[in-house]
Amino acid sequence: MSKHKGPVDPESLPYRPCVGLMVLNKAGLVWAGRRIVIPGDEMDGATQLWQMPQGGIDKGEEPLEAAIRELYEETGMKSVSLLEEASDWINYDLPPHLVGQALKGKYRGQTQKWFAYRFEGDESEIAINPPPGGHTAEFDRWEWKPMVKLPELIVPFKRKVYEEVVAAFRHLVA
């Protein structure tokens, strides 16, 4: 939580560099996890809690490295093969009431580089609660979902991102 007391001008804050991962199974369905809501985070008060894995890019880390790391930290998945990298970075802005609070109060939203992977392993390797390596659980459930349904499952302020991601990777299930 930010210690800032008044309204924060979003234009004064940067976007947090992140990666997002669309993981498809052999049937062409996409892995989605239901977020655990933490009071004060960007999902607080949301009812659409399903999302694909995503996370920050550490200083000095390449996006592809961050993608593999985040996927493992959030889901335990290692048995994946890269299908494609989205050509563009996709941004989203936090809603005004979350600027200065969510994302540790440091960012106006995220700029995300998306990757599509094929899950090649056995579902028994998927571990979300607890995830491997002592990481904090981000999801309490997971399911394979049809790609076209993803935008309606995500919190509304990230919906445009999911529409763009689905458009970028739709051909992978055609």
Swiss-Prot record:
Keywords: Hydrolase. It is an enzyme of class 3 (hydrolase). GO terms for molecular function: bis(5'-adenosyl)-pentaphosphatase activity; guanosine-3',5'-bis(diphosphate) 3'-diphosphatase activity. Residues 14-167 form the Nudix hydrolase domain. Its EC number is 3.6.1.-. One of its GO terms (biological process) is nucleoside phosphate metabolic process. It comes from the Bacteria. A motif (Nudix box) lies at residues 55-76. Its cofactor is a divalent metal cation. Belongs to the Nudix hydrolase family. RppH subfamily. HAMAP family: Nudix_RppH (MF_00298). Accelerates the degradation of transcripts by removing pyrophosphate from the 5'-end of triphosphorylated RNA, leading to a more labile monophosphorylated state that can stimulate subsequent ribonuclease cleavage. NCBIfam families: PRK00714.1-5. This is RNA pyrophosphohydrolase. It comes from Brucella anthropi (strain ATCC 49188 / DSM 6882 / CCUG 24695 / JCM 21032 / LMG 3331 / NBRC 15819 / NCTC 12168 / Alc 37) (Ochrobactrum anthropi).
